[in-house]
């Protein structure tokens, strides 16, 4: 029995080994066959296509500008332009539109809808403000008033007129002593304007205000200097820069053609070469023909790059002057006559608030609030 059992176990082992070997060989053959199979004709899986979204108009003008300072300004509200406007950061706003609607008076652009609804002067944006953008875009909101509201406000805009400046508290000597504002007084005056809620209109805005097309805040003021004397550059402009106040330098372009010393200084014309007296002691503005005046002012505008407003030398002007100014394409002329700009003021005879030596902060407040 034992001998027979051993034989059976031996045969069984041989059979099992044979089966295992067959399985191994067969499995290996199967693996070999799968690895070396002929690939089937399969349909490749579709890949997700890249979808290109078109740029918005605001994104497009920024892309076209190719400048990291570029900023697309979009406008919201009744009468707002549909197209965005290109501006540049590190500069002041330029040429913001003044829309028109029948029977309405535009009341400005604001940084928020709430600001527009409240006519918040602190939120109002114009060419006195630096361009500030987020992701190279900014949105401005329109506000409107009725003509009756605008007229009832009875806004009067002072145009401040400075000439030369002195660092001497006791002033300068000589017959032009009154022209030299003490720079300490000037600093206090500019600080007052900067910190008490004044609005600084552009000349475009002043023109629209005179027409009754634009409402200006009650506390509006325009800062100007005549002659572009070196003391303006050395003493006054640093103060203008410190307080970030829009100002105008009326330049005699035959005498000097300096570039604007600050983004807050607009160069405008004090004529090219008419700041000289004729034989009768009066300025060329009232001695020359309209054609001669227009030719001089055209030269000045070409040098300055703008022919918008002129300050009359010595304040002299007449109807011939006005004709020459209009022929040259200027909109406005500034006199030395005292007064305030109101709706309907003669654009070619703008009055001023003259600031002389000895007029401190109290004198300014008594004149402009």
Model regions and ranges:
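Hydrophobic alpha-helical membrane-insertion segments, chiefly the h-region
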Residues: 17, 22-34
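N-terminal pre-catalytic segment of deacetylase/amide-hydrolase enzymes
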Residues: 110, 114-219, 358-369
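Sec-dependent signal peptide cleavage junction
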Residues: 29-45
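Secondary-structure capping and domain/repeat boundary segments
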Residues: 41-107, 111-146
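Extracellular/periplasmic catalytic domains that process cell-envelope and extracellular macromolecules
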Residues: 66-68, 100-101, 132-136, 145-146, ...
């Amino acid at each position: 029995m034992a001998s027979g059992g051993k034989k059976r176990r031996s045969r069984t082992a041989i059979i099992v080994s044979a089966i295992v070997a067959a399985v191994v060989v067969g499995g290996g053959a199967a693996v070999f066959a799968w690895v070396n199979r002929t690939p089937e004709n399969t349909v490749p899986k579709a890949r997700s296509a890249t979808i290109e979204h078109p740029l918005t108009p605001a994104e497009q003008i920024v892309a076209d500008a190719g400048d990291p300072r570029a900023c697309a300004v979009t406008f919201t509200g009744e009468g707002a332009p549909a197209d965005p406007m290109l501006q540049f950061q590190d500069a002041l706003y330029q040429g913001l539109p003044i829309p028109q609607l029948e029977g309405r008076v535009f009341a400005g652009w604001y940084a928020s809808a709430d600001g527009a609804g409240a006519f918040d002067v602190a939120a109002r944006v114009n060419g006195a403000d630096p361009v500030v953008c987020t992701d190279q875009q900014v949105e401005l909101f329109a506000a409107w008033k009725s003509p009756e509201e605008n007229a009832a406000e009875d806004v009067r805009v002072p145009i401040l007129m400075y000439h030369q400046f002195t660092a001497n508290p006791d002033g300068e000597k000589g017959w032009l002593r009154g022209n030299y504002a003490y720079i300490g007084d000037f600093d206090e005056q500019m600080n007052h304007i900067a910190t008490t809620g004044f609005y600084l209109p552009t000349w475009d805005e002043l023109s629209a205000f005179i027409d009754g097309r634009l409402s200006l805040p009650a506390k509006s003021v325009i800062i100007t200097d005549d002659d572009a004397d070196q003391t303006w550059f050395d003493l006054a402009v640093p103060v203008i820069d410190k307080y970030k106040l829009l100002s105008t330098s009326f330049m005699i372009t035959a005498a000097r053609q300096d570039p604007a010393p600050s983004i807050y200084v607009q160069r405008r014309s004090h004529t090219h070469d008419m700041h000289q007296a004729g034989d009768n002691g009066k300025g060329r503005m009232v001695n020359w023909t309209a054609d001669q005046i227009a030719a001089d002012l055209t030269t000045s505008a070409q040098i300055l790059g703008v022919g918008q407003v002129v300050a009359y030398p010595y304040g002299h002007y007449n109807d011939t002057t006005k004709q020459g100014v209009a022929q040259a394409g200027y909109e406005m002329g500034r006199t030395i006559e005292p007064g305030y700009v109101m709706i309907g003021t003669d654009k070619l005879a703008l009055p001023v608030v003259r600031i002389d030596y000895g007029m401190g902060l109290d004198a300014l407040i008594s004149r402009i609030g």
